[in-house]
């Protein structure tokens, strides 16, 4: 039996509860690095992506640092997506929320060895970028259409679909109902060797 004296009790306020004062501490942006016994995570100050050993929990290296890039410069970032081979990452910035799980953002391609940072696209913000398995292509959605960026061709950008239109046709993204009910925000992927893209196409033209 545990007894707590009234003198030691503290009053709880609505502000304490809603401010996150009693929220559990979490670690953001953890991703295993494929083919290794290490993982990557965003630093506590939100300025870096560091790698750590699963065995020891100790930091091994800094993979990305906003203050140490060649080419483009950014002040901060909201997330990252490692390439399957672990040599590059997509850096997510200027995030704009849409629904519960969906958002658009400005992405950059970062090469870890050279510290080179370059825009994924010179167009408007992108959604749900995904790497090909060889890490040499990135597909993304903009304005309900799918685009492809080829890294070996000087980041050449190709528009894959052209029929996407708000409230009519959606390529590569779930509609709001599917996003909400099934809990996903991307509806496209590469095949194993990166020669094809498979996606869902939603036609809402007859939806009232």
Describe each region flagged by the PLM.
Residues 8-208:
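Beta-propeller folds
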Residues 1-7:
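Hydrophobic h-region of N-terminal signal peptides that target proteins for export
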